[in-house]
Structures are given as structure tokens and as C-alpha cells.
């Protein structure tokens, strides 16, 4: 009888041990499963945060690295500024596409009457977001109003205000329609410009693209013939013929070893036909 009772006691002990081992295994599995799940969740959260940070960074306006300067404030080396007047237009987005494809930044001078067109404003915002500069080209592009009637400063301030409202930037640079010569030859109007804190930029190369609708190759020829200095500022317009040859113009400057630059208010240098250092 003792042997039988002793055997049954051993069986119960073994069963208890097996049961306890089973519980330990189940608990261990649950612990490791939850730890793995928590680790996976944490990793996903880290990945989501990282992706969000990258997306936010992508939305920040492009910042051009500061360039080395000469004593007159102009950049050193072979530098070209591509500039486009008379936008925004139905072509602005396509110009931005080409510039994006070539990773080139440009400077746009936009007209107030066009900026008021809400259908164009998304591309104005896009231009700034992608690192381009948007300056003013007056409200009316009317030489009599701007120069004879002395409305240059009021129109430019109004245009700059529109740009600020659309993009959130605070540009100071303007381009006088038809250039500062002869438009700004009177010192009185230049005094008004200086007092208003407005800056002026003309150009070093005139592509004459606006009158070459049926001869786009001549635009490229004009640009090539006039490219003679290390620093060049090319005047172009938002025209179909210009869009057509823009890749060729970009390739030309790349082959010549030019760096593409975009205007920055804090790095302004004098570039006006009147040679007025205040502007």
C-alpha cells in the first residue's frame, strides 16, 4: 500500500512540474511576443517620425549656399543668372519643370496684373518653394505711367506687396520694364526708389526672345554671342519660344563651366544701367 501511495504521489509531483513548466513557457512566449510587438511599434513610430521630418524638410524653401564675393559684391568665378520677365503665365509651371529637371534656380520678375490671376498663384508659390526668386516687374508695364507720370515706385510697391501676400516672402528687387535706361534717367525718380528701399536689376545679355516667336534658334544664338564675361545676367521672358530653347541654353552654360545662381536680397550687387550705387 505504501508503494502504491508513493507512486501516486510521484505522479502528482511530475504533473505539477509539467504544469508549472507549461505556465512558464506560455508566460515567456507572451512576454517575448509583446516585447517584439512593442519593438516593432516603436520602430514604426521612429520611421514615421523620420519620414515626416523628411517631408517637412522637402517643403522648406531652397537655400542657396553663400557665394564668395569680389570687392564690389559680385560673385567670384563663372556665374550666370537666368531671369524671366512678364510672368506669371500659363507657361510658368512648364518653365519650373525644365528648371527642376536640370536642377537650376532662376530669378523671376512678375507683373502685378498677372499676379492677381488666382489661376497662376499656385505656380508663384511653387517657384519660391523650389528655390527660385520672385521679384517685381510693375503692375502695368506701361512706360508712360511708370516713368512720365512717376508711378514707378507706387506700382513696384504694390507688386511687391502682392508677391508677399502670395508667397510669404519679402522681396526688394525689381526690374524696370524696358530697363532703367532711359526710364530711370531722372535723379528724382531714383531718389524715390532709394528712399523706398527698392533695388533694381537690369541685365548683361538681352536674348530678344520676345520678338523671335518664329525663330527660336536665334534666341540661343543671341545668348551665345553675348556671353563674354564671367558674370552674366540673361534677360528672357515667359514665352513659348523661350521655353522651347531653354534646355539648350542651360546646356550651353553648363558646357562653358558656369555656375547657375539665383538672386538673394542679402547678397545684392549693383546691376543697373544708370550705375546708381544706391539701387
Q: What are the language-model segments listed below?
A:
Residues 10, 34, 39, 48, ...:
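Detector for Asparagine
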Amino acid at each position: 500500500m505504501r508503494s502504491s501511495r508513493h507512486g501516486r504521489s510521484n505522479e502528482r509531483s511530475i504533473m505539477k512540474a509539467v504544469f508549472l513548466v507549461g505556465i512558464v513557457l506560455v508566460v515567456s512566449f507572451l512576454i517575448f511576443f509583446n516585447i517584439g510587438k512593442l519593438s516593432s511599434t516603436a520602430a514604426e513610430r521612429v520611421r514615421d517620425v523620420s519620414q515626416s521630418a523628411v517631408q517637412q524638410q522637402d517643403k522648406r524653401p531652397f537655400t542657396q549656399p553663400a557665394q564668395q564675393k569680389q570687392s564690389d559684391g559680385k560673385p567670384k568665378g563663372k556665374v550666370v543668372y537666368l531671369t524671366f520677365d512678364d510672368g506669371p503665365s500659363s507657361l510658368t509651371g512648364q518653365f519650373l519643370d525644365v528648371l527642376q529637371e536640370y536642377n537650376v534656380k532662376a530669378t523671376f520678375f512678375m507683373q502685378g496684373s498677372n499676379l492677381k490671376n488666382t489661376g497662376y498663384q499656385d505656380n508663384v508659390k511653387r517657384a519660391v518653394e523650389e528655390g527660385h526668386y520672385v521679384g517685381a516687374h510693375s503692375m502695368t508695364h506701361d512706360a508712360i505711367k511708370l516713368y512720365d507720370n512717376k508711378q514707378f515706385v507706387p506700382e513696384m510697391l504694390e507688386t511687391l506687396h502682392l508677391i508677399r501676400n502670395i508667397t510669404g516672402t519679402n522681396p526688394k528687387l525689381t526690374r524696370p520694364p524696358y530697363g532703367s535706361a532711359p526710364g530711370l534717367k531722372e535723379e528724382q525718380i531714383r531718389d524715390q526708389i532709394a528712399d523706398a528701399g527698392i533695388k533694381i536689376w537690369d541685365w548683361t545679355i538681352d536674348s530678344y526672345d520676345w520678338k523671335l516667336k518664329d525663330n527660336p534658334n536665334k534666341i540661343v544664338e543671341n545668348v551665345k554671342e553675348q556671353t563674354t564675361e564671367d558674370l552674366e545676367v540673361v534677360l528672357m521672358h515667359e514665352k513659348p519660344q523661350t521655353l522651347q530653347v531653354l534646355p539648350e541654353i542651360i546646356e550651353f552654360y553648363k558646357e562653358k563651366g558656369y555656375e547657375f545662381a539665383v538672386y538673394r536680397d542679402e547678397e545684392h550687387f549693383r546691376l543697373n544701367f544708370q550705375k546708381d550705387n544706391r539701387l
